[in-house]
Amino acid sequence: KVMGAAVGRPVDGQKQSQEVAGYPAALSQAPAVSGEGTDFQLVWLRAMQGAGPEIATDELISAWLRHLGHVHGEYPYARANFGRDMPPPVSGVFDNPFREALGAVARADLWGMVAPGDPEQAAWFARRDAMIDHSGAGVEAAIWLAGMASAAFAEKDISRLIEQGLGLIPSDCRAARAVRDVVRWHGEHASWDRTREMLLRSYSSEDGRDSVVAAGLIALSLLNGRGDFERSVVTAASCGWSSGCTCAATGTLLGLVLGVEGLPDEWRSAARDQLVAGWGVVGLSRNASSGVLADQTCELGRLVARAGATPWEEL
């Protein structure tokens, strides 16, 4: 995730497509700094370590209020709704013009990693999380991504992985339609830039952080990358828009599909173990070891598995 973000962050928010170089030299020159999605994940991870696999939504909100200071996009509107004693899903909908932005998508892959091989459980976690500050496509795209992250522990075929994620959300929702259109367009044209153009023509909005566009660009990057880590994250960066999020998500999914040994040698050798939390994290240590975080995530995955999956019908 961090390696993907390192490619996408310099061009994040640029709405023109461009050819982006691959391996970022910055990986070996300084500790990785987390973006907003990883900031949330660091806080969610700490909260889940304390509360266990059956963590309540109220406990996530409490951790947010104590440790997250993000004040842009959807976040201040959700905070204001917490202050009005509005629980989810109302907190994600009421007076929130960014309810379908990509904030929950940017953090959703964590839920797949703590529910490995159990996409329905990952979807359950992701839905509860996303509804805190989103609704509609902002929730559905997050569920799709979480389901793919979970399935990627066992499913290595990119097309089938995308379909497994789609099976967790309504087939007629905008996120699902956009992803299926991308699959079809890419199959017809086999060109990432042509497919990107068609996606933006059909689904783009004024908000560069739109979750539907983000889902479509993630799907496009996976398809165009054909299982190659560098090609996939470079495609996401070349597409622009919300490339900080889309490159990070694409990097996560390819990392799960390929495993550490399947990543390019030059990327693995350059990546540093240190992760520095972004400015939005407050009241927690700003420095972390990527290896320790991975171990903690794996341990939570074991706890979730032992606790038993939440029946899909409860959604």
Which stretches of residues belong to each language-model region?
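Structured, active/binding-site neighborhoods that engage oxygen-rich ligands
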Residues: 1-315
